[in-house]
Every structure is written in C-alpha cells, then in structure tokens.
Amino acid sequence: QEMLRGGRLHKQRALLDELSKKSLTRQGNILKFYTRATLQRIEEKGIAELVCIGPQEVDLDNLLLEQPLSLNPSQQEAMDAIDCHGFNTWLIDGVTGSGKTEIYLQCIEKVIRYGRQALVMIPEISLTPQTEKRFRDRFNVEVAMMHSGLTDQERLESWTEAATGQAAILLGTRSAVFTPMKNPGIIIIDEEHDQSYKQQDGFRYSARDLAVIRAKQEKIPIILGSATPS
C-alpha cells in the first residue's frame, strides 16, 4: 500500500474492489471504467493476473448493453439497402452528426449475431477512446485495438484476440487492415476520404483500397463513411 500514491491509490483500490467480486473478469469490461495503465500497475505488483482463457462464446441473449436508437427515414433506408452477406461496397454520405455511427453499430450487431467479427477503421489515434467507448457501451463483447500508440505487448494481445476470434470487434487505424481475423464479417471505414489512411513513407499503401480488396477476398461487405466522399 505504501507504493501507491494520490489519485493512483484511489483508482487502484477501486479496481481491486471490482476485481474481488469475481474470480474472473473480462479485460474489456474493466477497460470501460479504468485505464490500461491502472490495470497494468496492479498486475506488475502481483495483485492481479491477466490470463488468456481462449475464445469465448458471445452471449447473444445479453449482447446489447444499451438498446439501439430509432432510425430516421434516411438511416432506415441505408440499413435496408446494406446486405451483410457477401461482398459489396457501400458508401454512406453524411455530415458529422447525421447518424452514420448508429448505422455502423446496427450493422455490427447483425454480423456479431451471425457469429462473425467486425473490423472498424478510423483515421486518427485520437479518435480511438471515444469510438471504443461507443462500442463498449453498446456491446457486451471484447473490443481489440490496433494502432501505433500501443506497446508491443498490447499489440500482440490485440493481434491474438482478433486472430483467435476472442475479439468480436477490431478497432484501429490504417495498420489494422493487415490484422488477421478468425471469422471476419464486415469492414467499416469511417471518414474514408481522410489522407491518414495513406501510408506515405517506406511501404506505401492506401488502407482504404486494401480494405476493399480484403473485403472482396473475404466475401464480406465493406462500408465507407464520409461527409466528403473521395
């Protein structure tokens, strides 16, 4: 206890209280309320242990932690048009706040209920926390991250979760397009026009274009969202 100080002490004690309620707790559920750093600190002290217990069945009866929003006519038209079976490219043209995210969420729900995974790509690392929160607030599933801000260990964990099917959702920036997934069901690229999806140094590529190729190879749909489509 002497090793803990200030705000860290309060956060770590609160996390320990939460962990003590169950013998096993999903890492994804912990990260809804606590940072990876807080979890890592108590793990380093030997107070808690992070273990991999292999892919888990998604509890479809309790998949949703919050109910979907009602769709407006334009959103409903888009949902009715999007076929979550087989390859096709869908463009959702809408300004910020027009409801693209709710369409993404409801499409993701569909593929998870089919027993498949979703790859969601965003242009900037800074958008990760708010996007991750939206997914964790809606779904009772594992969400893996893939971006350059992760440590090697975190990147390995996310890679494993996606490749084994433990993570139902993989959220990441352009490099996420290369991450293997056990049973991919849909790819979603938000702000597809953003130049951040293009790697300009070293091995040059367009993550958006590669995602379309991957979707075609996997025979799954891909949704491109943008306020200013390229």
For each predicted feature, which ranges?
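Accessory, non-ATPase domains that flank or precede helicase/AAA+ motor cores in DNA-metabolism machines
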Residues: 1-228
